[in-house]
């Protein structure tokens, strides 16, 4: 089945939008942002294996799932990570909680879809 929405909330950022920082154009936005309250459940958009659960300056708390065939999803700015590296997760399983960690202006989930080294717009694969 296609991917599920990883969180409930309002879409606050779309794939490919141009980012401006200190008046300077930056790289395009390589994900979909879903805004909501801190603690909102984050669900696995598709079944897979947790290959990274860590914290970074920009992305804050971050999870990456490997879905096979070089497809992976990235979940960033999490308040809590509820999965561990190496764990197999089913589509729709709670894997984390929405937060405002890393470089953000408010609580949201940054959700990215990768195919090998390429970032793709996840929206066409999500319901509705």
Give the location of each predicted region:
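Catalytic cores of peptidoglycan-degrading enzymes
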Residues: 4-128
């Amino acid at each position: 089945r296609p991917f599920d929405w990883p969180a409930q909330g309002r879409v606050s950022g779309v794939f490919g939008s141009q980012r401006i920082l200190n008046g300077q154009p930056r790289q395009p936005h390589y994900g979909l942002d879903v805004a909501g309250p801190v603690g909102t459940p984050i669900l696995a958009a598709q079944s897979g294996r947790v290959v990274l659960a860590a914290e970074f300056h920009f992305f804050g708390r971050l999870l990456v799932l490997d879905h096979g065939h070089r497809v992976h999803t990235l979940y960033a700015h999490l308040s809590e990570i509820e999965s561990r590296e190496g764990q197999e997760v089913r589509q729709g399983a709670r894997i984390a909680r929405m937060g405002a960690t890393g470089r953000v202006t408010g609580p949201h989930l940054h959700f990215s879809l990768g195919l090998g080294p390429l970032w793709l717009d996840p929206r066409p694969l999500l319901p509705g």
